[in-house]
Amino acid sequence: MSSKKEFYIKRKRRRRKIVFRRITKLVLFIGITVGLMFLIKSFFKSGASEYKERKPFFKSVSRVEKLKKVSVPEWVDVQLIHRHSTARTGTELSDIKNIVIHYVGNPKTTAQNNRDFFDKDATKVSSHFVVGLNGEIIQCVPLYEKSAASNERNKDSISIEVCHPDASGKFNTETYNSLVKLTAWLLNETGLNEENVIRHYDITGKLCPLYFVEHEDKWNDFKSDVKTELSNLKK
């Protein structure tokens, strides 16, 4: 009877030892798991912090910064006006969201006439480019600076004034072709597309460029031609 009792006591002790070992292993497993989780969390936290500190080095270059390095094509006559009044303040664009088309509103005046007008001290208006009656193109303001042509949108747009032979505001063939070429080139350099080409009218409601306001179909044709030219540039 005594031996039987001892047997049960020993078996009970063995069970306790087994349970104790299992509990010990479980505690160790939980401890190791928690420790690993803490290490992983610390690693990613420090990695995120390091990335945050280095982020400026990977910041994408803005369209404005890119334009500072753009070389203007040889078919553009660069005649920058001097800094004065509001015509050219030297203020940089905040962004480039649109290319804005205007018409000069003075029939038969040339690109040179309009550029020289912008350059006068008393003049408070200007545009980045003027497209002339013979298809000539004059640049008046650097691409990355504000011009004074599109009201509140001067801060984030590039403006093009276009000459016309008569009061209808319709551009002749040479002028039109140069306008398409210039607009497509600007879109290609800024990463925009034909849908980003707008009229002065679309900003303020002013009838400018007159012919494209009065003939919506011709405006759409123009954007279509720009799209085709842009596609050719990308080939």
Identify the meaning behind each predicted range.
Residues 101, 158-160, 197-199:
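Hydrophobic faces of well-ordered beta-strands that scaffold small-molecule active sites
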Residues 2-150:
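N-terminal catalytic cores of peptidoglycan-degrading enzymes
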Residues 94, 122, 153, 168-176:
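Solvent-exposed, acidic/flexible segments
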Residues 17, 24-26, 32, 39-72, ...:
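Basic/polar, cationic surfaces and motifs that engage anionic cell-wall
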Residues 151-159:
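Short coil-to-beta-strand
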